[in-house]
Amino acid sequence: MEKQIKIALAGNPNCGKTTLFNALTGSNQFVGNWPGVTVEKKEGKLKKHDDVVIMDLPGIYSLSPYTLEEVVARNYLITERPDAILNIIDGTNLERNLYLTTQLTELGIPVVIAINMMDIVRKNGDEINVKELSRELGCEIIEISALKGDGVMDAAEAAIRAAKGTKTVPMHTFSGPVEHAIAHIEEAAVHSMPEEQQRWYAIKIFERDDKVLEKLTIPTETMNHIEEDIKAAETELDDDAESIITNERYIYIAQLIKGCYKKKSTEKLSTSDKIDKVVTNRWLGLPIFAVVMFLVYWVAMVGVGAPATDWANDGVFGDGWHLFTIGAADYEEATAEYDDQITRRD
């Protein structure tokens, strides 16, 4: 009898994970609750593959146990250790979804990524370089539309191949101080674990994850040495350990998106923005400034300035002033006669 293959579906809430689960299993699924909690548990057999079980994990944003759903999903992944993880990503919101991906690839379990809603991505005019993203993350990526059923069986077949192949090796690394501390933690606290699991546990110890520390019961002396490494990294990077890991994940994701994702520009530039774009150009700015200053000088000194100055000099303050005295003598004579008549009457 062939060994049963377990594939876990993992992804953010509302990424299309449950739609994909229904498409893969049809009516051949079982619904219940996870032991001890009210979180729904769904599993089923892959269509036409009785030896493949699909587990629909609760929607989560990370593997840090902040919510009940995250606790349930994480416990299943690190305890049951499925043969492969099919990570569903919303293609219209890569940055948020890839945060979980960076953690899943550290578990030492084969990971296949299914980028969902690719039909919407294309409709929006956006582009995802799937080949480059796959190379950077170190795992196979399949484009799907769970709602339309496009590519769903291709994603399942890729997960089956991954389950029978090699483990996913995380491609991203953290900064020097963090990697230095993680290496010491692996050597001091988790060296007896299977090699593919060591890095994830070391990162969680660096983050001071309470549930991991409680599970491992690391000797006090060893933990004191580890704390020295963690505090050294915190001092050098001026932040707490958990925030350091979070920030560096997002820095890595930003670099991924910059190289693999191209968003269609939908902004229409206003007239003033278009002018600004030209006049502030590093190559055109100075020539345009010189031309504008020349025009201002020409208008002031030649175009308007010279005629206006000539008119003022000749017409107002020069010989032209006599124009204003035309008829003045007659006016003065008439005024004098009028004054004489008034005097005689008196």
Segments predicted by a language model, with ranges:
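Conserved G1/Walker A P-loop phosphate-binding module
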Residues: 1-66, 79-80
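Cytosolic juxtamembrane amphipathic/interface segments immediately preceding
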Residues: 73, 261-278
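Conserved nucleotide-binding/hydrolysis micro-motifs of P-loop NTPases
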Residues: 27, 36, 59-60, 91-95, ...
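Conserved C-terminal guanine-recognition region of P-loop GTPase G domains, centered on the G4
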Residues: 46-49, 72-141
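Hydrophobic core segments of alpha-helical transmembrane domains in multi-pass membrane transport
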Residues: 288-299
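Interfacial/capping segments of alpha-helical transmembrane domains
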Residues: 299-346
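Membrane-interface helix starts
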Residues: 267, 279-289
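Alpha-helical transmembrane helix bundles of large polytopic membrane transport and channel proteins
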Residues: 112, 122-265, 335-338
